[in-house]
């Protein structure tokens, strides 16, 4: 069993070899928008899982996921041969291709966040012209300011409290 660091290095090398082969050597038109996003190799170095995503030909066109999966399955033997020649390991790992759903999930999250921002903006527009129901301060007791005379006499009573230190001048 190989150490995990070697498995990570091999996974990165396999990812580079397969991506290069898909881009430059394999002439299947269904692989035109395929990008290898990640790869993982088991610790015994016998199995490699390659994650891929497919881009459409334009922004409006939906990617051909089924066509890309079929093309990768068809090219699996050629790709494994290239991996064996490029890595130099004793046993060439078997390749498995899995569609990467992270970009789709990220796009979905961006849509949800945009929808939440729009709802917040709508709520802010509604709040602009809104007024509070009832009085401005329902707990305000009217007339307290008038009893104190508004000159701070109430505050002066509370300043001269006895602290129990025999009436020092510092109080």
Curated annotation (Swiss-Prot):
GO terms for cellular component:
cytosol
Q: Which UniProt keywords apply?
A: Cytoplasm, Ribosome biogenesis
Under the heading PROSITE patterns, the entry gives: RBFA
Q: Which PANTHER family match?
A: RIBOSOME-BINDING FACTOR A, CHLOROPLASTIC-RELATED
- Residues covered by region (Disordered): 126-171
Q: Spell out the InterPro entries in the cross-references.
A: KH_dom-like_a/b, RbfA, RbfA_dom_sf, Ribosome-bd_factorA_CS
- What's the gene? rbfA
Q: What is its main location?
A: cytoplasm
GO BP annotations of the record are:
maturation of SSU-rRNA
Q: Which family does it belong to?
A: Belongs to the RbfA family.
Where does it localize? Cytoplasm
The record describes the protein's role as:
One of several proteins that assist in the late maturation steps of the functional core of the 30S ribosomal subunit. Associates with free 30S ribosomal subunits (but not with 30S subunits that are part of 70S ribosomes or polysomes). Required for efficient processing of 16S rRNA. May interact with the 5'-terminal helix region of 16S rRNA.
One MF term in the entry's GO annotations: ribosomal small subunit binding
Q: Which organism is it from?
A: Mycobacterium sp. (strain KMS)
**Description of how the protein assembles with itself and partners:** Monomer. Binds 30S ribosomal subunits, but not 50S ribosomal subunits or 70S ribosomes.
Alphabetical list of Gene3D superfamilies matching this protein: 3.30.300.20
Q: What is this protein called?
A: Ribosome-binding factor A
Return the Basic and acidic residues bias intervals.
Answer: 126-138
